[in-house]
Amino acid sequence: MANTKGGLVVSKQEMTKMWIDDKFVAVTLVKLLPQEIVRFKTNEKDGYVSAVVGVEKKELNKDKGQKVDYSMVTEFLVDENFLSAHQAGEVLDTNLFDGVSTISVTGQSKGKGFQGMVKRCNIKGWSATHGHKFTRSGGSKGNRKPRRTMKGHPHAGHMGSEQKTIKRIPLLKVLEREGEKLMVVKGSLPGARNSKLKFFVE
């Protein structure tokens, strides 16, 4: 079931470690980006309910007829309670995650280019000795019958640069550093540094 409690757009910063419960825990720091609710989509007009969020509003010259623009416009599925509690033009903040212990994260994974089967599909490979020349090759693609390559067979190809969603990630704390709000989550997150991620309330 999709999350319908809203969310935030953040920027991935760095990984570090924190001392939690008498042990070091690997954590990821993400920075809250300035964002506001542009408008709402409703069942009557659009067939579903969501909040359209604009991230990093750009300063444009209205005298030249330039319209409002954002570096990113996305939307979050919301419920009727979210509609009644928020309005268009409202700036979203980390208080949306007050009392929330776990979140879902969606982002673009790092692109790794064209990779072979050993790295892309995690196959073992072949013997490195006894005169074998094809240690990291794919080998046979199938049997004499059914005379075709079966679906799901590992092959070399493009790896990474895919949308990934990770659920039930522990949200540890919210910090403020140099006027910026940082959120600390346990473990690693998809994407490169400074890439945008979507945090969903679970």
Where are the regions that the model predicts?
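Extended basic (Lys/Arg/His-rich) segments that typically form rRNA-contacting surfaces
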Residues: M1-E202
